[in-house]
A protein has these predicted regions:
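Membrane-interface alpha helices of multi-pass inner-membrane proteins
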Residues: 221-237, 248, 274
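Membrane-helix boundary/interfacial segments in multi-pass membrane proteins
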Residues: 3-4, 48-58, 82, 103, ...
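Active-site lumenal/periplasmic loops and adjacent helix-entry segments of GT-C-fold
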Residues: 37-200, 237-238, 423-433
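Membrane-embedded, hydrophobic transmembrane alpha-helices
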Residues: 1-28
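Membrane-interface helix-loop-helix junctions at transmembrane boundaries of multi-pass membrane enzymes
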Residues: 25-28, 212-221, 257-270, 323-349, ...
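Signature aromatic-anchored transmembrane alpha helix within multi-pass, membrane-resident enzymes
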Residues: 30-31, 265-277, 334, 341, ...
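Hydrophobic/aromatic-rich transmembrane helices and adjacent perimembrane loops
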Residues: 115-121, 241-243, 363-389
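Extracytoplasmic
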Residues: 390, 402-581
Length: 581
């Protein structure tokens, strides 16, 4: 019965969408569609309240916001105290400002921004499709398909079937990455960065269509290109290469087709992109300086296996919609023969972002972000097919749409709320408080009795959120007790997060050795090496160690360098002092 739930939900969503199409000529039709468009997100937040706080890297993003509120700009890494954050923090600065202004928790602000970004993206996609095909129904299909379901390959029963084909897995022909679809899953996550990037990318597409497809171009569209590029560079710089590559590709295609006639527009577009990067160069320098090369995104021009796997994966992913486009090829040919430059521009962007997914590689697989943009743009382009199906083969259209929505339905029903959380909480104003009295007493002491730049050694990863202070280094000791069976708000291990952000192993390994010394059950004494390392740090910052069991308490209490400053049950806080009594 559980397997039928996504199918039933998909059919219900398709029925609701068809109803929205039916009333789209009503003066409130578009607003009703917008409401329907954000309902899946509202449903997730209402059905799984913890998802809003814990989802994906929820604690990571909240802890960065708290670092900024504490006065750290640029923020330090909350799980690598004192080290600058090698991760885009533009959206966290925005969220921190709203949190301080409205006295709402970061999780609440992230959720509100997600709803706003989703609604604005739906509007922009509708406008883009309207520009392409001059058809309101096609616009509704574009918004629907690009956000909610452009492929059914990545999640659901079909995806599970593909992953069971041993031949594909063994010869590495197919590399499934469920993070890429459905696009709405990006709008459900915290961080307000990826989703803002998708919105700004849609604004970029909308702007260049106006620039190249109108004889007289308002300066406002050059300005919006500038703003979209600047915004992406600040809020989600990984999409900046996609804007640059798409701009150059579109300029090349248009110059080849139109010649010097569009030269002024081409130069104007390139100038906007270049000028938009100048103001954020110091910011980009800050978040990239110090990254090790192994964390970088590189070209995989000579990695045959990678290129073949990425190409085959992309082909399988888009095959369902390609079949439908091929089915409606006569209609597509008619559109292209009408010299529809806007469609050519959109196809160019689809191909460019697809090639970026194929030819770029990174140890963390972060190139999947370009797959998101390609599928998102392909969803807009393919709307003419579904518009025609709706007019001429409505039952087939209903069945196909229901199938395409199965991944989203699976995400809503299962992926967004399966795991129990590790730490029950209460939201009050700007902050999260732990429901367990002893734990809450610990974090209350930390947040009220220690300096904002104090750093802590702890076997848990909770202090950056509940105590709003930095960890000397994030340890994965606690995770070993529950593995991946619970949601701790970080999703990835601390070790992986630091590695993905590009911190040198020399720094992280040293700190991990020092911090782990306190929780090593095989020894009963703090090493001189650990004391010496903390002594250097304590010259600039107060250093505290949290003990959560009797053995660790006894071990730390033996050292003359640590003074107990807090105790609640078996949990205690010790402050490091280089002065020996």
């Amino acid at each position: 019965m559980d397997n039928l739930q996504p199918i039933v939900l998909s059919a219900a969503l398709t029925l609701a969408f068809f109803w929205a199409i039916k009333i789209n000529n009503h003066k409130l039709g578009v607003w009703i569609f917008l409401l329907l468009g954000i309902l899946p997100l509202i449903f997730i937040y209402l059905r799984y309240p913890d998802f809003r706080v814990y989802d994906w890297h929820g604690f990571l993003h909240a802890s960065i916001v708290y670092q900024i509120i504490n006065g750290s700009i640029p923020p330090n890494n909350p799980i690598l105290a004192g080290e600058p954050l090698l991760y885009p923090w533009g959206s966290h600065l925005l969220v921190a400002s709203i949190v301080s202004l409205l006295h709402l928790s970061p999780a609440t602000v992230f959720a509100l921004l997600n709803l706003c970004f989703l609604a604005l993206t739906l509007i922009l996609v509708f406008k883009i499709s309207l520009f392409l095909y001059s058809d309101r129904v096609a616009g509704l299909f574009a918004a629907f398909m690009s956000i909610f379901g452009i492929t059914f390959v990545h999640r659901g029963p079909f995806a599970e079937g593909l992953n069971k084909i041993n031949f594909l897995v063994n010869v590495k022909l197919f590399r499934m990455d469920i993070r890429a679809t459905p696009v709405i899953s990006k709008f459900a996550s915290s961080g307000a960065n990826n989703q803002f990037g998708i919105l700004l990318f849609a604004l970029f597409i909308y702007s260049i269509l106006h620039i190249f497809c109108h004889v007289k171009v308002g300066k406002i569209y050059y300005f919006t290109v500038f703003i979209s590029s600047l915004g992406i560079g600040f809020f989600y710089p990984i999409y900046l290469p996609a804007i640059a590559a798409s701009s150059l590709a579109c300029c090349a295609v248009i110059y080849f087709q139109q010649g010097r006639l569009f030269l002024n527009k081409i130069l104007g577009l390139i100038a906007c992109i270049v000028l938009s990067i100048v103001p954020i160069l110091p910011y980009l320098h800050q978040i990239t300086t110090g990254k090790v090369q192994t964390a970088a995104i590189t070209l995989a021009l000579f990695k045959k296996q990678h290129l073949f796997t990425q190409s085959f994966t992309y082909f399988i992913t888009v095959l369902p919609v390609l079949i439908i486009i091929f089915w409606k090829r006569k209609l597509l040919l008619k559109i292209l023969l009408n010299a529809n430059l806007s469609v050519i521009i959109l196809i160019t962007i689809v191909v460019t972002t697809a090639l970026m997914w194929i030819f770029m590689t990174s140890p963390t697989g972060v190139e999947y972000k370009y797959l998101i943009l390609s599928l998102f743009t392909l969803g807009i382009f393919s709307s003419f097919c579904f518009r025609d199906l709706y007019s001429n083969q409505r039952i087939i259209c209903f069945i196909l749409l229901s199938i395409f929505l199965i991944p989203m339905s699976s995400f809503i029903l299962y992926d967004s709320g399966q795991k129990p959380i590790t730490d029950p909480y209460i939201e009050k104003g700007m902050y999260l408080f732990h429901k367990q009295p002893n734990e809450n007493a610990l974090y209350s002491y930390i947040s009220s009795e220690t300096k904002p730049d104090a750093l802590f050694v702890d076997s848990y990863l909770t202090i950056p959120v509940f105590g709003r202070r930095q960890l000397y280094i994030g340890l994965d000791i606690r995770r070993k007790s529950f593995g991946w069976g619970k949601n701790d708000g970080w999703t990835s291990t601390a070790k992986r997060l630091l590695s993905e952000q590009g911190y040198p192993s020399e720094i992280t390994d040293l700190r991990r050795t020092v911090a782990s010394d306190f929780y090593d059950k095989t020894s009963n004494k703090i090493s001189k090496y650990t004391v010496d390392k903390l002594a250097k740090i304590s010259k600039k910052n107060d250093v505290y160690v949290v003990a959560r069991d009797v053995k660790t308490n006894n071990k730390i209490a033996k050292s003359e360098h640590f003074n107990k400053v807090f105790e609640s049950g078996v949990t205690a806080i010790y402050k490091f002092s280089n002065r020996v009594n």
